[in-house]
Amino acid sequence: MTLIYGHRGAKGEAPENTLASFEQCLKHGVRRCELDLHLSKDGELMVIHDPTLKRTTERRGKVIEHIAADLVTYDARKGGPGWMHPCPIPRLEELFEKCDFEHWQLEVKSASRTRAATTVLAIREMAVRHGVMDKVTVTSSSREVLKAALELTPDLSRGLVAEYAWLDPIKVAQGYGCQMLALNWTLCTPERLEKAQRQGLHVSVWTVNEPALMRRLADFGVDSLITDFPGLATATLGNG
């Protein structure tokens, strides 16, 4: 059975990477999610996709230039589906406290060696504190992040985010001891899927929003798909 992950919560239905979006995902019975993390100026894990604030909050500057106490007051509704109420940028901790997901894909964007190390250690500390070590996979396309995760937090599950095939994504994933391969759906051929699964990788494809494509990838046998529309996915595939 192909599992469903809500992309940034339910990005097509509610403001991405906000509490409202993750609650919307859970309303559909989808208890797996993908989200993006950046560090605040004071080292807290903030749930936001871009390194800058402009696209979702219309504020200036980078996430890393603002302290968490300020970031959680910024309304992140801009550019998404219409939403009546303000949707502030959440801390990861708030989501761990308020959302009962069975599994979390925590994507860490590219980072310097120092920031990568700080980020993966912070994730591990929070996952331990909230008892979700077995429910978390740290994913990234950044070699620095995956290297830091392998060396500093080897007991955290890891996943390679692969958008291009110019380097063999299966080989790269294996090189960092990954358990998951988060694959751009355009790269998901039956041959690559079979090879990855044969080598023990959970293959999670993104971002899949068309019902016909959902069915085709499920027929291929992908382990999971990541979608902006978890409600549509459950209606199409009949599972959460």
What are these regions (language model features)?
Residues 9, 38-42, 50-51, 109-111, ...:
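Active-site beta-loop-alpha junctions enriched in small/polar residues
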Residues 49-160, 179, 199:
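Metal-dependent phosphodiesterase/phospholipase catalytic core, i.e.
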Residues 14-24, 88-92, 118-120, 162-173, ...:
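Short, acidic/polar
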Residues 82, 159-240:
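C-terminal active-site rim and adjoining tail of enzyme catalytic domains
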Residues 1-49, 54-59, 80, 115-120, ...:
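Conserved N-terminal beta1-alpha1 strand-loop-helix module at the mouth
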Residues 4-6, 33-35, 104-106, 136-138, ...:
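Hydrophobic faces of well-ordered beta-strands that scaffold small-molecule active sites
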Residues 1-13, 75-78, 143, 189-195:
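N-terminal small/glycine-rich loop or linker at the start of catalytic domains
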Residues 7, 25, 36, 71, ...:
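Conserved, mostly hydrophobic/aromatic
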